[in-house]
C-alpha cells in the first residue's frame, strides 16, 4: 500500500524533481506539512530539520532556487518575522498530493 502511493507520487513530475535529491522525499514531507498547517518554519529551519543525506547549505539553497524557478515551491514572508522566509508547495501540487493520498484538504 505504501509503495503504491509512493510510486504514484513519483509519477508527478514536480514530486519526481523534488525526490531527485537524496534528501528529497524528506524535504517533500516537511514542506507538505508546513504548507498544509501554514507553519511559520523558515528556510534555515527547514534545512536544519533534514536528518538524512543532507547536502551542504549552499547546494540546498541552489536546489530551493531551482524548485522555485520551476514553480514547484514558492517563498513567502513570515507573518511573525519579516526577515524570515517560509516555503510553500504550489496549490496545484498540494491538490495532486491530496488526491493521490486521498486526503481532504
Predicted regions and their residues:
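Short amphipathic alpha-helical elements of helix-turn-helix/winged-helix folds
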Residues: 30-37
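Short acidic, hydrophobic short linear motifs in intrinsically disordered regions
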Residues: 37-50
Amino acid at each position: 500500500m505504501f509503495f503504491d502511493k509512493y510510486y504514484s507520487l513519483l509519477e508527478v513530475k514536480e514530486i519526481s524533481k523534488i525526490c531527485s535529491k537524496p534528501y528529497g522525499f524528506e524535504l517533500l514531507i516537511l514542506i507538505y506539512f508546513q504548507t498544509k498547517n501554514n507553519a511559520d518554519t523558515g528556510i534555515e529551519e527547514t534545512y536544519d530539520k533534514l536528518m538524512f543525506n543532507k547536502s551542504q547549505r549552499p547546494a540546498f539553497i541552489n536546489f530551493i532556487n531551482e524548485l522555485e524557478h520551476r514553480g514547484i515551491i514558492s517563498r513567502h514572508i513570515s507573518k511573525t518575522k519579516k526577515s524570515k522566509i517560509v516555503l510553500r508547495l504550489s496549490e496545484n501540487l498540494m491538490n495532486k498530493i491530496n488526491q493521490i493520498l486521498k486526503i481532504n484538504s
